[in-house]
Regions:
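Glycine- and acidic
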Residues: 2-6, 56-61, 92-110, 149-160, ...
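Gly/Pro-rich turn-and-neighbor structural signature
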Residues: 2-5, 151-222
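A short core secondary-structure module
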Residues: 2-51
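C-terminal amphipathic alpha-helical interaction region
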Residues: 266, 281-402
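Alpha-helix capping/hinge segments and adjacent helical runs
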Residues: 68, 174, 196-274, 371-400
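Mobile "lid/hinge" segments at catalytic clefts and subdomain interfaces of large enzymes
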Residues: 103, 110-114, 118-126, 261
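Flexible loop/turn segments at secondary-structure boundaries
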Residues: 5-8, 28-30, 45-48, 84-85, ...
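A glycine-rich, basic-preceded beta-loop-alpha segment at the flavin cofactor/substrate interface
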Residues: 44-60, 65, 72-103, 123-149, ...
Length: 402
């Protein structure tokens, strides 16, 4: 048979390639319950570890893609290839999902990296590029024009990318710490709690960070104006490369269905409630601080809205499961903002504690947090409204009218 979309399916960077292949045994039951996992090497390996003859697994062609040209995406053909079963028969999907979850986290971090590098380049360009005068009057009167970083919309694009990078880093590092505890903590109960939280956050890391990466790289290309569209400047490559992150290792729609359908409604909101309690505890601790009101008040308000929204969607889904599909993508983005708001509030707390230190690091953190709460978090109001609009506006159009 053949497999398509195999990343790095053929290359000469290592002596051997080990392909993990999902396949069906001759007597396997139908459907996903009959899929097994096999290890299929490019070269057969001897008992002593030495490489032997070529296995019957070949690259039949390369995909011609929009981006990620540094990765050979292959069409792989297997005809009589020799493979070794991994795990038990007919339980290949369960084994594969161990790797899929790690890959999804990796895609989120990949998106985060593209967000950061695009931001860093755009900042340098915006400080150097002269164009127009500020609407309020010249900011660099000694120059023929002002640097474009003085213009409000350029600032908005740069700050959006910066906020998505900083919020994304906080989420990625927090999730990595949870994984460390899940794997290594001596207390089994703590390991279980961390595993549950990682399960909840994984689709958010993958989908929210990759959605944000697409937005951020597009904004940063826009900062360059026409030069951003020119290949030699490098910005358009970040945009092209970021687009795949919303598609592979499970599309972001699949991530949203996983979050809402399995991770939230699947356990009657137990995982989400645990995370919500962390937010509630933080809000209670910091609610007495006047300086923290601009952060904890909208955080608490959004937490309450997510709780109510989840209940409403759950009740609709009980009547018609398609309601989950209608709300899931917007719901994940709301949850992503809730998580970011929590981390930005925590970062703001630390920054406020060091505000008199004179360190620009803390001043920048506080400013970024304020931008996020003022300019990005309000997106949730519209998303919640579209979630509540439900299934009917999507499905009432007769198929023949498309």
């Amino acid at each position: 048979g053949a497999k398509i979309f195999i990343s790095a399916g053929e290359h000469d960077m290592v002596p051997n390639i080990l392909h993990l292949v999902l396949a069906r045994l001759p007597d396997a039951p139908a459907g996903s319950k009959g899929i097994s996992l096999f290890l299929v090497p490019k070269f057969l390996v001897g008992a002593d570890g030495s490489l032997g003859e070529r296995n019957a697994i070949f690259c039949a062609g390369l995909e011609h893609k929009m981006g990620i040209h540094g990765n050979a995406t292959c069409q792989i053909v297997l005809e009589g290839a020799v493979g070794t079963m991994v795990g038990e028969p007919n339980k290949g999907l369960a084994a594969m999902f161990v790797m899929m979850n790690a890959a999804r986290l990796g895609v989120g971090v990949q998106s985060l990296g593209l967000t950061e590098v695009a931001y860093q380049n755009a900042v340098v360009y915006a400080k150097d590029r002269l164009q127009m005068r500020a609407l309020s009057g010249p900011k660099a009167p000694d120059k023929p024009a002002d640097p474009i970083i003085v213009h409000p919309d350029v600032r908005k694009m740069l700050m959006t990318a910066r906020a998505y990078a900083e919020g994304g880093r906080a989420l990625a590092i927090y999730t990595a710490l949870l994984i460390d505890k899940e794997l290594n903590h001596p207390d089994a109960d703590v390991r279980k709690e961390c595993a549950d939280e990682v399960a909840l956050l994984t689709p958010i890391v993958k989908a929210f960070l990759s959605d944000n990466g697409w937005i951020a790289t597009s904004h940063c290309m826009q900062v360059y104006g026409g030069h951003g569209f020119i290949h030699e400047w490098g910005m358009e490559q970040y945009v092209r490369d970021s687009r795949i992150n919303m598609i592979y290792e499970g599309t972001n729609t699949i991530q949203s269905l996983d979050l809402l359908g399995r991770k939230v409604l699947g356990d009657n909101g137990a995982k989400l409630k645990k995370f919500g309690r962390k937010i509630a505890e933080f809000v209670e601790e910091e609610g007495i601080s006047e300086a923290m009101q601009e952060f904890v008040n909208p955080l608490a308000e959004l937490g309450d809205k997510v709780t109510k929204l989840t209940t409403e969607i759950g009740m609709k889904a009980f009547q018609n499961p398609d309601e989950v599909g209608a709300a899931a993508v917007d719901y994940l983005r709301v949850c992503g903002h809730l998580v970011f708001a929590y981390f930005f509030a925590r970062m703001a707390k630390v920054a406020l504690e060091h505000k008199d230190s004179g360190e620009t690091f803390y001043k920048a953190k506080l400013t970024t947090a304020r931008f996020y709460f003022a300019k990005l978090l309000p997106e949730t109001a519209g998303l919640i409204r579209t979630c509540r609009a439900g299934l009917a506006p999507l499905m009432e159009m007769d198929e023949a009218l498309f």
